[in-house]
Amino acid sequence: MNLNHNNITFIIVTFKSENIIHDCLKTLPKDYKKIIIENSGNPKFKEDLEQKYDNLEVLLSENLGMGASNNIGIKRCNTKFAYVINPDIKFKENTLSELIKGAEQIDDFSILSPISNNSRYPNYTLSKKISVSSNILSVDCIDGYSMLINKQKFRDDIYFDENIFMYLENDDMCMKKKNEKENLYIIKNSLIDHLGGKSSDQKHKKDIELLRNWHWMWSKFYFNKKHHGIFYALFRSLKSFFSSIIKYFLYAIILNHYKKKIYKMRLLGIFNSILGKPSWYRINFKN
């Protein structure tokens, strides 16, 4: 398939990402369109970025989460392909050129991505290794921090599940496309760096960790229930549920209040998901 600057738009969801977004943007090619969805609604963030970078539009939004915010950007762009990336990734000099070369060897795809530069943390999963060529790997799932999406494969205009605030929204999308017999590929000659856990300002690290634990547990139960049914979801949650209870009381005994709060958040995430409540938990940042 033919990929170029005329048919790809980069989509980046940010939340208080001032300290990291510039490192990401500087590695992206200047002649490609970019849309940033800023979930903190910060007008100064929008003004600063749009003044500094060409071909860039910043949309201000309330804190909708990864799935809903990415959907805004994907639907906003008028190109055939939307390249969803996290603000804590960096392209190498030849990341995009090698991705394009790989795509030229493929007749058709739904989602495509470079491969993680860190082999210990692959950005894909597969049940059986299927190599289309020495450079192209057919996979079951691709991590959400780098997903080149072929919009023509989403004719219903439904991309990420907006019920999910964060975690497993990419797994949900990939499972849907695989069930539809669509193709997902990793291009092995195209490398990408992912810093991991650096997407937001680190001064909010503790609050964000609480948020992540709540939503990780909520999303796991929701995902399993959606794709495998309520009983499977309950069964898969048992170990995490009892482990969180034990650790909650353990950290209460040794007076580690922050760790205790983490496991409280995990329990609350599971409970809310079991009760069918939405992924509502947010942090009220003061600045």
Stretches found by the model and what they are:
Residues 131-152, 208:
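A recurrent flexible, glycine/aromatic-enriched loop bordering the glycosyltransferase active site
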Residues 146-159, 163-191:
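A short, conserved alpha-helix in the catalytic core of glycosyltransferases
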Residues 90-124:
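Conserved donor NDP-sugar-binding/catalytic core segment of glycosyltransferases
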Residues 14-30:
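Short, well-formed alpha-helical segments that are part of the catalytic scaffolds
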Residues 60-77:
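Glycine-rich, basic loop-to-helix element that forms the pyrophosphate-binding segment
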Residues 25-59:
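Acidic donor-binding segment of Leloir-type glycosyltransferases
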Residues 82:
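Short aromatic/hydrophobic "clamp" motif used to bind/position activated sugar donors
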Residues 211-219, 230-287:
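Non-catalytic, C-terminal membrane-associated alpha-helical segments of glycosyltransferases
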